[in-house]
Amino acid sequence: TGSGYQAAVASRLAQEVYTIERVESFDARVREVFHELGYTNIVCRIGDGTRGWPEAAPFEAILVTAAGRRVPQPLVEQLAVGGRLIMPVENDRGRQVIVRMTRTSEEDYAQEHFLAVAFVPLLGAFA
């Protein structure tokens, strides 16, 4: 979540948005801002974003806004068939690239790599 910017943008593109914040003080402030601005379709919680939100899964789309060495397995498992995950991932040369993973069936996924980027590091149990 951080500042809440991505969640606010996503709330205008999706019916419902779930966002996870690691820092309690950020979460409290973002909830206030969302309330003040009338964003009623954003659900927030504090936790480890690499674990996802299994109680609300499956998701049609997952957006990760920090870079990891790989896509966290819990997030992959929480994608709906046909769902997409977008995330910056570090490649074998140590550079970050945007990855789009699409769940094509219960067991299969397609992965595409796009432009080079620079994001903050992903933190958490599955980072």
Where are these regions (language model features)?
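Substrate-binding/catalytic lobe of Class I Rossmann-like enzymes that use SAM or dcSAM, i.e.
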Residues: 90, 97-127
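Conserved nucleotide-cofactor-binding alpha/beta core module
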Residues: 1-106
